[in-house]
Design a protein with these regions (language model features):
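Extended hydrophobic leader/signal-anchor segments used for secretion and membrane insertion
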Residues: 2-160
Length: 160
């Protein structure tokens, strides 16, 4: 009941889609901080073919020591959340940084710190079929290019 009332009051303050995404991101972050797993419907093609638009993903909270290259993680941007594959972990000035990349993206994402990481994708549902996240690392550069070409083609075909 509390959650429903809270969402109702939040929805009254939302004027734009951007506001809605920020509120949902904040709510997801709060739930993950409390140890709750999230079931979210994916949108976009940045993780194609591992995660496709309409797939359901399960995001669970993750401890820093459990973050491994190849894992698919969710991290917080200013107004939304990004779900990409962790490709590099490095330390600078006694602080750990994590770099992700979408499976069909041309470039790496900006470095993020652990406090920006919301959780790790534990499962992907394609329809009713449960898929485990592909923890292959490193992904060859040619695979990124191939995935990008497929994504461009799918975007082009959606216009027809």
């Amino acid at each position: 009941m509390y959650l429903t009332a809270h969402l109702y009051h939040l929805s009254k303050r939302m004027n734009t889609e951007e506001d809605q995404r920020k509120v949902l991101r904040d709510l997801a972050d709060e739930l993950l901080d409390k140890g709750t797993s999230l079931r979210i419907t994916a949108s976009g093609y940045s993780m194609y073919p591992a995660i496709r638009p309409g797939n359901t993903i399960i995001i669970k909270p993750v401890e820093e020591e459990d973050l491994k290259c190849g894992s698919i993680i969710a991290w917080k941007r200013e107004k939304d959340m990004v779900v990409h594959r962790l490709v590099l972990v490095y330390e600078s000035d006694n602080k750990k940084y994590y770099i992700t990349r979408g499976d069909s993206c041309r470039s790496l994402d900006r470095p993020v710190t652990h406090d920006m990481i919301a959780g790790r994708v534990e499962a992907i549902y394609k329809g009713h079929r449960l898929m485990q996240p592909n923890l292959v690392h490193p992904i060859p550069e040619r695979r990124y290019r191939a995935n990008r070409m497929k994504t461009i083609f799918l975007g082009y075909m959606r216009k027809f």
